[in-house]
Amino acid sequence: MKLDAPFNLDPNVKVRTRFAPSPTGYLHVGGARTALYSWLYAKHNNGEFVLRIEDTDLERSTPEATAAIIEGMEWLNLPWEHGPYYQTKRFDRYNQVIDEMIEQGLAYRCYCTKEHLEELRHTQEQNKEKPRYDRHCLHDHNHSPDEPHVVRFKNPTEGSVVFDDAVRGRIEISNSELDDLIIRRTDGSPTYNFCVVVDDWDMGITHVVRGEDHINNTPRQINILKAIGAPIPTYAHVSMINGDDGQKLSKRHGAVSVMQYRDDGYLPEALINYLVRLGWGHGDQEIFSREEMINYFELDHVSKSASAFNTEKLQWLNQHYIRELPPEYVAKHLEWHYKDQGIDTSNGPALTDIVSMLAERCKTLKEMARSSRYFFEEFETFDEAAAKKHFKGNAAEALTKVKEKLTALSSWDLHSTHEAIEQTAAELEVGMGKVGMPLRVAVTGSGQSPSMDVTLVGIGRDRVLARIQRAIDFIHAQNA
């Protein structure tokens, strides 16, 4: 049989990996980690990374899921050299190989009815035998190829399949445990396990990084590869990701979709850094640049044990990257959250200034956008608890006094606004908090914000003065 590569297989490329999701849902964090490990191993070895969409499940695969997977990969910045390739567009190729296998006696047509197979299974279970096909049709030549049938791979019956898993070490499965796998359905469509084999061969895949739930598929795929004379890649099966309760990660543990983490305000750098450490390590190092990940990553350092997802650690990493990445870069991601929350940022401070002001205060960009709305829009009401606490005593007098001083400023900058607050406190013979806190509630609507001088400059003179007057009127109305 001949190789039929969908792209030029550069002989100088010694490592070629792939990520091959099924488009039946979103890109979840487990899949994203598999993609990351596969991508890192290719980059570490100056190799190539292939994106393949395994959409043979025609009933469950959707264009929306495919688009979501590609969007997730792009957001994580995991670019591919080849692809995306779609299995549904390669059916002719798969069927060509199957037909050749039938001709060479490596596969055979099976005409057994569903009733016969169910009866066979029932008998085997009663005899406490492992259910398996009995090869009834292997030597049956009394049927026409036009009759309804499936095609089965003629699996070896002797010996065993042995492979060295790059993560788990030596794995051996006896061929007596394996069945004659169906490789083409009655409707003529090839099955998942067969398509994977042909794709890995045609695309020159040297290393297959995937979840441990695929271990049982591996011996079947290796036997097909051997039968068609294709090279056998190195397999690396990574462990599952659990929730913090030890159960398999699911929606009840919180977000599981990669793009949900985007929506919740996480930077891709934080999620990538978190995922790489979720089953792999380099000493005690916790924070890795992309370059460090590529330089250090090795499959034999990937843990065999399941990893527990810890949202608090992800938040810690996210705040680190919000603080440390260039404000211009963070601002680009922050902009999406303002739009998502319907906040018009055209009239207010630069988003880079928002990042600089709030980087130490916010764990997520969603929180940053929500908590900075007052810089761009008017708020309807004062926070009830903050107003009750700070709009009392001489608050109205303090606000009136500080408004006079702010109105008189010739320059609206950090030094001048800070001085106005300081002078007001001195003249009233009170602490800075007795002026600053009522002022904070007056101009932001809440009891939390960056330092007052930074906040006032960010909001702008006209808005500040109008909001102070509104607060004064509110206090008088409350006391009337």
UniProtKB/Swiss-Prot annotation:
Quaternary context: Monomer.
Main location, first listed in the record: cytoplasm
Main function: Catalyzes the attachment of glutamate to tRNA(Glu) in a two-step reaction: glutamate is first activated by ATP to form Glu-AMP and then transferred to the acceptor end of tRNA(Glu).
Motif position, 'KMSKS' region: 248-252
Name of protein: Glutamate--tRNA ligase
Cofactor(s) the record lists: Zn(2+)
HAMAP family: Glu_tRNA_synth_type1 (MF_00022)
Biological process terms in GO annotation: glutamyl-tRNA aminoacylation
Residues that coordinate or bind ATP: K251
Listed EC numbers: 6.1.1.17
Subcellular location: Cytoplasm
Family, per entry: Belongs to the class-I aminoacyl-tRNA synthetase family. Glutamate--tRNA ligase type 1 subfamily.
Molecular function, one GO term: zinc ion binding
Pfam families given in the database record: Anticodon_2 (PF19269), tRNA-synt_1c (PF00749)
Gene3D superfamilies registered for this protein in UniProt: 1.10.10.350, HUPs (3.40.50.620)
Gene: gltX
Cofactor: binding comment: Binds 1 zinc ion per subunit.
PROSITE patterns from the UniProt entry: AA_TRNA_LIGASE_I (PS00178)
Binding site for Zn(2+): C110, C112, C137, H139
Motif residue range(s): 'HIGH' region: 21-31
Cited InterPro entries: aa-tRNA-synth_I_cd-bd (IPR045462), aa-tRNA-synth_I_codon-bd_sub2 (IPR020751), aa-tRNA-synth_I_CS (IPR001412), aa_tRNA-synth_I_cd-bd_sf (IPR008925), Glu-tRNA-ligase_bac/mito (IPR004527), Glu/Gln-tRNA-synth (IPR000924), Glu/Gln-tRNA-synth_Ib_cat-dom (IPR020058), GluQ/Sye (IPR049940)
